[in-house]
């Protein structure tokens, strides 16, 4: 609550006269996005870092995403973030994918590098940075992940890329994502050499041994 209050106060102090013809554009593309606090965080970060950029939200869905990306690219946008429902659809519209984005098949950050759109997935990286900041090294360790949502898959991929010996994913066998996650685990193992296995949540023995 304090953080939100601080950001809101900063937003109220924001001077629109600071925006000029040189100000770079960055954005969030998703639907819905009106509730997002991303503009508060990013615009305050730009201010503190002395960067001449502005961050806006655009309500864009999977159907309108291709036209939106083409238009933003033409206008020279420096980069943009993706939120639901666009993280998977954006992949086919990009020129290049980072290693983790290739493994996950989803992108939340796009950089416009002189007209070449490069996609990244920063969810796993952000999580692993927090782990490192807490003084932990996952190299050669087993990672246990509960759930098969987008953030979970990103953490699995980043764990494998960062040197984990194994990743154990626990999910409901009745989940509609079970088969997709099984293929993801097999592909991640083959591409990284990390042993990635999928277990049923009800396999309490496997869960206990993994933890």
Where are these regions (language model features)?
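NAD(P)-binding Rossmann-fold cofactor-contacting core
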Residues: 164-188
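Phosphate/diphosphate ligand-binding glycine-rich loop within oxidoreductases
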Residues: 18-134
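Short, Lys/Arg-enriched N-terminal segments with co-localized hydrophobic residues
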Residues: 1-15
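Short acidic low-complexity segments
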Residues: 192-211
């Amino acid at each position: 609550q304090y953080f939100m209050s601080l950001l809101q106060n900063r937003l109220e102090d924001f001077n629109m006269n600071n925006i000029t013809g040189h100000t770079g554009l960055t954005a969030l593309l998703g639907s819905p996005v009106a509730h997002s606090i991303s503009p508060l965080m990013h615009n305050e970060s730009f201010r503190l870092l002395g960067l001449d950029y502005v961050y806006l939200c655009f309500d864009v869905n999977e159907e309108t995403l291709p036209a939106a990306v083409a238009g933003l690219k033409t206008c020279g946008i420096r980069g943009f973030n993706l939120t639901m429902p666009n993280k998977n659809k954006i992949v086919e519209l990009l020129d290049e994918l980072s290693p983790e984005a290739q493994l996950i098949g989803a992108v939340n950050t796009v950089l416009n590098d002189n007209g070449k759109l490069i996609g990244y997935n920063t969810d796993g990286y952000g999580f692993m940075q927090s782990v490192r900041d807490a003084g932990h090294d996952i190299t050669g360790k087993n990672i246990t992940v509960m759930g098969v949502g987008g953030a979970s898959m990103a953490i699995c991929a980043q764990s494998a890329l960062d040197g984990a010996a194994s990743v154990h994913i626990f999910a409901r066998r009745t989940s509609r994502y079970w088969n997709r996650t099984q293929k993801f685990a097999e592909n991640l193992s083959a591409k990284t050499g990390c042993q990635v296995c999928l277990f049923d949540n009800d396999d309490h023995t496997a869960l206990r041994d993994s933890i």
